[in-house]
C-alpha cells in the first residue's frame, strides 16, 4: 500500500512540475495544437520554441519590473518609519506557507485537482459556459496554498476533505473568472486569442463595466496624444516610459534623502543610478512587447487544432503581463495613479488611527494598475486610466485591510497579496466561511 501511495505522490509531483513551468506548458500546448492541425514537424518545433521563448521574455520582463522597484519601496518605508502588513503576492505565499507548516506539501494535490477541475468545466463548456484554461502556474500555486489554508482554518476538516474542497473551489474560480473577461480582453488585444490568468480577473471585469464613461478611446488614447512643442517627445513609447519612470521613481527615492539614494546606488553617482532605473523600466517594456508578439502569434495559430479536435470552447489564459504591451503608456500611467490611490488610502488609515496599516509592494501597483490602465485606455482613454486606477488603489488598500483579519495570518506579521480579486471576492468568501464555521461550530468555533 505504501508503494502505491509513493508512486501516486511521484505522479502528482511530475504533473505539478509541468503545470508550474508555464513556458514548457505553453510550448507543449502549442506543439500538440499544431500536430492536431496537421502542421509540418518544422512548424511544430519552431512554433513550440517561439511560444516558450516568448512567454519566458514576458515572465522575465515582469520579474525584472518587480526586482527593480522592490528595494525602492523598502527604502521609502524604512526612511519614513512606516510599518505594517505588506500588500504583495510574495507576502501571501510566505504567510500561508508558514501557516501550513509541515503540511505545505499538500498544496501540490490542491493545484493538480484545481487544474483538472478547470479543464473539466471547459471540456463541458457547452453546459457550463466556461472557456478559460488557467496556465499561469506560479500564480496557480499561490492560489492553491492560500485557499487550502482558508479551508483548513475556517472549516477544520481533515486534510483529504480540505484538499478536495480547496481544489474544486480553486478550479471553479479559475474557470469562470478567466471566462468572465474573455470579451473585454478580446477588445483590448484586438482578438489576440487569449484571456488572463492572474490575481485581477474580477478587477478587469469590474472596470470594463464603466471605464468607457470617462472619455473617448479614439480622441483620448494615451498612445496617440498629440502633444505640442517639446512635449511631443512623449509621443514615443520607449522615451515616454523612460522619462516618466525616471521622474516618478526618482521622486520617491529623493524623498528619502540623497544620502539614502547614494547607498542604493552602490558606488555609482546617485543621479546616474536614478536615470538607469528609468531606462531599465523602458527596456523591460520592450522585452515584454517582443515576448507577447512571439507568444500570441503561436497561440493563435496552434489553438485551432485543440478547438477543432477536443475542446471547442477552450481559450488559453496567460500571465497578466501579456496585456501591458498593448498600451505601454497607459500601463505606466496606470501604475502611477494606482500608486497615488494607494498612498491616498494609506493617509486615510493614518488619520483614522487604523489598527491595521498596509504597505504596498510593487506587484499590486504595477501588475494591477498597469493592466487595468491598459483596459481603461482602450475603453475610455487616458482620463479613464487616471480615474479607474486611482480608484483601484483605494479598493486594493481597504480590501486588504478587510482581508487580513479574516485570513488569520496577522500574527505572522507578513501580509496578503492585496491585488483586486484577493481584496474583494476572497474576503467575501472568508466571511461566508466564517459564517458557516460559527453556525455549525467548525474550525475556530468548534467546542
What spans do the regions from the language model cover?
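Signature of multi-pass transmembrane helix bundles
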Residues: 2-61, 105, 109-301, 310-320, ...
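Membrane-interface starts of transmembrane alpha-helices
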Residues: 22, 158-166, 329, 333, ...
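Helix-loop-helix junctions within the multi-pass membrane cores of secondary transporters/permeases
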Residues: 28, 45, 72-95, 208-212, ...
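Membrane helical hairpin/interfacial module
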Residues: 51-107
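A short glycine-/small-residue-rich loop at the edge of a beta-strand within enzyme catalytic domains
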Residues: 67, 94, 286, 290, ...
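Juxtamembrane/transmembrane-helix interface segments of polytopic membrane transporters
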Residues: 71-74, 404, 408-412
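Mid-membrane cores of alpha-helical transmembrane segments in multi-pass membrane proteins
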Residues: 80-91, 109-117, 136-144, 167-171, ...
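Membrane-interfacial helix-loop connectors
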Residues: 136-155, 339-401
Amino acid at each position: 500500500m505504501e508503494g502505491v501511495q509513493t508512486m501516486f505522490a511521484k505522479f502528482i509531483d511530475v504533473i505539478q512540475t509541468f503545470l508550474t513551468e508555464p513556458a514548457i506548458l505553453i510550448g507543449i500546448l502549442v506543439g500538440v495544437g499544431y500536430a492536431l492541425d496537421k502542421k509540418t514537424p518544422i512548424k511544430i518545433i519552431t512554433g513550440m520554441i517561439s511560444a516558450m521563448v516568448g512567454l519566458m521574455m514576458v515572465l522575465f520582463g515582469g520579474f525584472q519590473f518587480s526586482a527593480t522597484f522592490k528595494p525602492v519601496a523598502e527604502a521609502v518605508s524604512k526612511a519614513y518609519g512606516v510599518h505594517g502588513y505588506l500588500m504583495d503576492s510574495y507576502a501571501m505565499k510566505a504567510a500561508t506557507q508558514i501557516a501550513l507548516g509541515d503540511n505545505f506539501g499538500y498544496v501540490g494535490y490542491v493545484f493538480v485537482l484545481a487544474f483538472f477541475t478547470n479543464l473539466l468545466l471547459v471540456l463541458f463548456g457547452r453546459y457550463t459556459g466556461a472557456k478559460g484554461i488557467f496556465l499561469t502556474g506560479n500564480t496557480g500555486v499561490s492560489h492553491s496554498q492560500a485557499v487550502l489554508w482558508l479551508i483548513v482554518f475556517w472549516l477544520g476538516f481533515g486534510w483529504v476533505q480540505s484538499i478536495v474542497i480547496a481544489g474544486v473551489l480553486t478550479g471553479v474560480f479559475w474557470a469562470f473568472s478567466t471566462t468572465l473577461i474573455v470579451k473585454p480582453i478580446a477588445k483590448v488585444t484586438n482578438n489576440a486569442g487569449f484571456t488572463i490568468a492572474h490575481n485581477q480577473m474580477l478587477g478587469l471585469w469590474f472596470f470594463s463595466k464603466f471605464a468607457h464613461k470617462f472619455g473617448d478611446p479614439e480622441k483620448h488614447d494615451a498612445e496617440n496624444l498629440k502633444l505640442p512643442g517639446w512635449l511631443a517627445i512623449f509621443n514615443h513609447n520607449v522615451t515616454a516610459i523612460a522619462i516618466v519612470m525616471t521622474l516618478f521613481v526618482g521622486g520617491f527615492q529623493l524623498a528619502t534623502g540623497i544620502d539614502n539614494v547614494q547607498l542604493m546606488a552602490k558606488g555609482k553617482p546617485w543621479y546616474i543610478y536614478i536615470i538607469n532605473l528609468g531606462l531599465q523600466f523602458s527596456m523591460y517594456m520592450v522585452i515584454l512587447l517582443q515576448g507577447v508578439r512571439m507568444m500570441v502569434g503561436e497561440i493563435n495559430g496552434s489553438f485551432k487544432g485543440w478547438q477543432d479536435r477536443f475542446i471547442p470552447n477552450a481559450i488559453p489564459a496567460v500571465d497578466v503581463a501579456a496585456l501591458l504591451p498593448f498600451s505601454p503608456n497607459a500601463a505606466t500611467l496606470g501604475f502611477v495613479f494606482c500608486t497615488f490611490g494607494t498612498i491616498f488610502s494609506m493617509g486615510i488609515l493614518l488619520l483614522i488611527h487604523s489598527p491595521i496599516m498596509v504597505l504596498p509592494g510593487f506587484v499590486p501597483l504595477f501588475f494591477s494598475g498597469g493592466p487595468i490602465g491598459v483596459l481603461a485606455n482602450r475603453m475610455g482613454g487616458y482620463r479613464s486610466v487616471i480615474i479607474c486606477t486611482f480608484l483601484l488603489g483605494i479598493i486594493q488598500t481597504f480590501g486588504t485591510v478587510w482581508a487580513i483579519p479574516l485570513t488569520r495570518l496577522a500574527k505572522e506579521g507578513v501580509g496578503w497579496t492585496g491585488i483586486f480579486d484577493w481584496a474583494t471576492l476572497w474576503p467575501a468568501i472568508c466571511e461566508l466561511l466564517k459564517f458557516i464555521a460559527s453556525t455549525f461550530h467548525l474550525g475556530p468555533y468548534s467546542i
